[in-house]
């Protein structure tokens, strides 16, 4: 899922993977960016943040006008959009475009956006990812991130490498810690044991 904010860490991580020259996997059978698919699963149209949908429309992955509530008299269960983009948006709402003269420019990002018509909870979203898209894409590794999660630098690459280097590995998780923000506003609140819990 996506929480509505641009993820510069994701752009940097994707760029690092695409520019990786050491690995046979990333340089075999086509460009590295073609081996990565970002799949966004949103749990229901009504609870979805409209600003997030606007952001996704800006980068090209979402089109409001093509959705139908029903098809041939049957209620729509999910709306699926697929797009490859090289656009991104910063937290300050600035559009970032690729620059051919810059090696740190944005590589293409293949995206699938699954917008469920109704809120049917997290397990149903996981089913869409694994049973729906996973069967078609047949990925080597899936990394799940909840909305609002901000991975550290190189953390996605470290997870991928763990799976790639150990074929017996079935699952892994990263370390989670609270980000207290600037100015200690949240830090002061954590002094209250009820809030901290």
Curated annotation (Swiss-Prot):
Topology in the lipid bilayer: Multi-pass membrane protein
Molecular function in Gene Ontology: chitin synthase activity
GO biological process: cell wall organization; chitin biosynthetic process
Major localization listed first in the record, in broad terms: membrane
Catalytic reaction equation(s): [(1->4)-N-acetyl-beta-D-glucosaminyl](n) + UDP-N-acetyl-alpha-D-glucosamine = [(1->4)-N-acetyl-beta-D-glucosaminyl](n+1) + UDP + H(+)
Keyword Glycosyltransferase: yes
An example Gene Ontology CC term for this record: cell septum
Family statement: Belongs to the chitin synthase family. Class III subfamily.
Protein name: Chitin synthase 3
Organism expressing this protein natively: Exophiala jeanselmei
Protein encoded by which gene: CHS3
